[in-house]
Regions:
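Metal-dependent phosphoester-hydrolase catalytic domains
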Residues: 1, 6-128
């Protein structure tokens, strides 16, 4: 399992070209499910600007950075299980503004962080 804030959007990022793809494309990594949120698309629509030029869907965004035209992508955090782990569920904790829990993520200036929690539930393989 690889988890953390890699600050590497595979489509709209400004990190070293192809760096995160080396991990995402590795045969030992289970990428069968990409976590999503309801709040990412809402924030993208409300903020516009750079979000309008991003090629990856906003439902995959894991951070809410500055939206100046030309700024890099918002898929920054990753949770990547090993291929031998079955993904049961996944998501990004980024509720819509109407959700009472949105007070935990909020809008700028954020009450917590500009990064959102990425989570994956997996089933461990049976040990022999």
């Amino acid at each position: 399992m690889v988890a953390g804030d890699q600050n590497a959007d595979p489509v709209d990022g400004d990190s070293r070209p192809g760096a995160i793809n080396q991990l995402l494309d590795n045969r030992r990594v289970n990428t069968s499910r990409t976590p999503t949120s309801a709040g990412g698309p809402e924030a993208s629509r409300l903020q516009g600007q750079a979000n309008e030029s991003h090629r990856s869907p906003a439902r995959y965004d894991t951070a809410d950075f500055g939206d100046a035209i030309g700024s890099s992508g918002n898929m920054r955090g990753h949770v990547l299980p090993s291929r031998n782990l079955r993904i049961e569920d996944s998501g990004i904790f980024w509720p819509r503004q109407a959700d009472p829990l949105s007070r935990l993520t909020g809008v700028y200036p954020f009450p917590s962080s500009d990064h959102r929690l990425v989570w994956v539930d997996v089933t461990l393989p049976h040990r022999r």
